[in-house]
Amino acid sequence: TPGYEFVVREKLSHLIFHLYRAYEKEIDSGDSELDSDSLRMQKMLDYIENHFHENLDLSQIARAADIGERECLRCFKRVIQNSPMQYLLKYRVTQGAAMLLRSPASSVSEIAGQCGFNSSSNFSQMFGRFFQCTPREYRKRNKKAEDDG
């Protein structure tokens, strides 16, 4: 299925983050770097998940955890091996894929806007990069799979 690898990678990123949090609890290190990274990441990921549809920039994500932009970048790299903006882009595309299937009456353009993309062509381009098909093809294939199953 197109995009399967992307979805698996996204799920693995979340799993790695949660394992990281479990590990830092086990070592009981008080005010360690792991504790602060975990807390910061949770704040920044929550912010992204609640505001992904808005026009976000690095400074807004960093402010969510009360840190500077450089520390935000370092924290993301340490914990999920991705930049905040790469994570945001993947999150937007993943949400768009879910919306395509959940809201068949919504146009690709409407969904692009709801996911924070400034144009449907930009959304389609990014979607293709992650899912190796257009949003319309993705919707059609998944509808066919649903009808066949």
Predicted region positions:
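Juxtamembrane/interface motifs at transmembrane-helix termini
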Residues: 27-29, 109, 145-146
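Short, Lys/Arg-enriched, Trp-marked, Pro/Gly-tolerant hinge/linker segments that flank
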Residues: 1-54, 59-65, 78-86, 90
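Basic/polar phosphate-binding segments, predominantly the helix-turn-helix DNA-binding elements
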Residues: 47-51, 55-94, 112-137, 141
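Generic C-terminal helix-cap and adjacent flexible tail
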Residues: 140-149
